[in-house]
Design a protein with these regions (language model features):
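Conserved AAA+ ATPase small/helical "lid" subdomain
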Residues: 2-57, 62-66
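C-terminal engagement/docking regions of AAA+ P-loop ATPases
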Residues: 34, 54-171
């Protein structure tokens, strides 16, 4: 808007994934248990996730910033700065370990939200050659336009408490 302020809406599943990142990191054998995982990890991770969403909203001229799962990768420095690695983790590198932690956390939260939900139409769409060309800076309207062509995706989104009638940044 004219004042440059942006409303921020953090979807529940994003908050859950950020919390799960901390739990997964604490149980990851590549992360040093003696040093532990900082209790600030989820706080700084969420701050970075929200910051990336706000950056995208400002660049796109949107008035609402809504973090996406991909925004978790913008938080890599804040994640890697909150734990120390075991020898095996050192060999893989902090970024790779953090990416593994994010992937695991996303998968676990996804499984929790979509247990007993038929995801086959979405999988089939991709199996039949469906592709998306989306970047970190893709505006919400364009993201919605591209993902709207995936059969069954909006029905799945409703399980994540997303309504088809929500403004583009929220869908």
């Amino acid at each position: 808007d004219a004042t440059g302020t942006i409303d921020t809406v953090v979807p529940t599943y994003i908050s859950e994934i950020v919390e799960e990142v901390a739990f997964v990191a604490r149980s990851n054998p590549k992360i040093d248990k003696r040093s532990g995982v900082s209790q600030r990890l989820p706080i700084t991770c969420l701050e970075n996730v929200v910051s990336n969403a706000e950056r995208r909203a400002l660049a796109s001229g949107e008035t609402t910033a809504v973090p996406r799962v991909t925004d978790l990768y913008a938080a890599l420095p804040s994640i890697t700065g909150k734990f120390e690695l075991e020898y095996e983790g050192e060999l893989r590198g902090a970024d790779n370990v953090a990416r593994e932690v994010i992937r695991t956390a996303v998968g676990q939260v996804f499984d929790g939200w979509f247990t007993n939900v038929d995801t086959r139409p979405v999988i089939e769409w991709f199996d039949l050659g469906g592709t998306l060309q989306l970047g970190d800076a893709t505006p919400s309207e364009e993201l919605l336009e591209q993902t709207g062509q995936i059969q069954g995706l909006l029905e799945l989104a409703e399980h994540a408490r997303v309504k088809r009638t929500d403004p583009a940044p929220l869908v």
